[in-house]
Amino acid sequence: MLQRSLGVNGRKLAMSARSAKRERKNASTAASKCYVVPPSARGWVHAYSVTATSMLNRRKAILDYLQGAVWVLPTFGVAIGLGSGAVLSMIPVKSGTLIDKLMFQGTPGDARGVLIVVSATMITTIGIVFSLTVLSLQIASSQFSVRLLRTFLRDVPNQVVLAIFACTFAYSTGGLHTVGEHRDGGAFIPKVAVTGSLALAFVSIAALIYFLHHLMHSIQIDTIMDKVRLRTLGLVDQLYPESDTADRQVETPPSPPADAVPLLAPHSGYLQTVDVDDIAEFAAASRYTALLVTFVGDYVTAGGLLGWCWRRGTAPGAPGSDFPQRCLRHVHIGFERTLQQDIRFGLRQMVDIALRALSPALNDPYTAIQVVHHLSAVESVLASRALPDDVRRDRAGELLFWLPYPSFATYLHVGCAQIRRYGSREPLVLTALLQLLSAVAQNCVDPSRRVAVQTQIALVVRAAQREFADESDRAMVLGAAARATEVVERPGTLAPPPSTFGQVAAAQAAASTIRSADRDG
């Protein structure tokens, strides 16, 4: 697309852009992405690339909003129902044919009655569906986590069912004005339209049955956790590709020069997304550098520091007056956290389910253990991937843009810390955490990550020693900690099977403690 856009501006310009593209591809390294813009093509390349990328980012943002908007598909359903009803009402059916025998056979009064009954039934059904949907949202927020409401709102099957009901209602209601008499006094019955209304009524019955089936399964805790896990793993693959498994050389963000201009948050909210490509392209064409110091997912207040920007070159200086504003246009702040670029939010959703399960109101430690199992899948993948900041440079190595990402220790802390604190009185929850840490340690290559795992193991041991008065409970946790520590200290060691951390290990620890007490007695 880049060559096609530049081709209209001259063959020389297109060749220059293709050459720049080849040089950029050869000069890219594992540590950063490079943007090379020839001086002759800088204006056109910048205008095209920023516009195209901005449109793509806007489409992603709009799509993310529409996926969570319940009104979109029902609105399309109403439009389709009205349009198809108007078209089918104009289709004549020749009397006496096979098609005529399959169509609605009745008087204009019968046709009007059918359409009224279908319309009234759909209104009642839509009310029932809305009530059940609100009930499921209430269950999700009270039993699991209020941060899961967005997941339920994005549920496409619910939106499709509502769209079918809305389409049937609009189709039948719109068909009422077509039933009547011709100008010559003859009766007019839109047989095709009335038959279509009856067909849509049966489709709506099938949709209602499917909706009830889907709703009963969607509020199950296993289904909810699996959805959150899969979405989080999908984001991990997007931000940290699987092919990029080797740990990169750690880069330290540069210190902003004295005349750097701060990037201040225009309003309060959560940092949801950053259009990295837009800012990097603009910085490459304008010889500026931008550095963010705030993580995606953090809450910022109006006027709070997001980062810095300054002019690149032999004599750095303050950027032009429009550069900070252009950067801020591509830094999106909203009232809620999203999973577009925030892995920690996916971990937070799962942790919230565990904390709600461990609360005195529910007291369901097994659900918390299930959450830890799903967390281990995400944390193990993070342990096996390189987790660099998103750094963009030009071919000369000049920094264009720097977006920081949380470290592995931060991800591990988010997944373990609060569950350890709230589950410190249940030994099986702590052993599940140690099973998680053992699986994570098996995938760690970087020694610093093993240190982070060892720190979490030590914190679990301290919690067990502080909370458990029963020797068997304490022995079970300490034994699991010893097995996890062995995996940490011996790279290449496989994590023990889950049975060594669960109920079997608990029974063995209890029996061993009783035997020891009997011998001592």
From Swiss-Prot:
One Gene Ontology cellular component: plasma membrane
Which keywords has UniProt assigned to this entry? Cell membrane, Membrane, Transmembrane, Transmembrane helix
Pfam families, per the entry: DUF2254
The record's section on InterPro entries has: DUF2254_membrane (IPR018723)
Membrane topology per the entry is: Multi-pass membrane protein
Membrane spanning residue stretches: 68-88, 114-134, 160-180, 192-212, 290-310, 399-419
Sequence segments annotated as region (Disordered): 1-25
What compartments host this protein?
Answer: Cell membrane
The name of this protein is: Uncharacterized protein MT1328
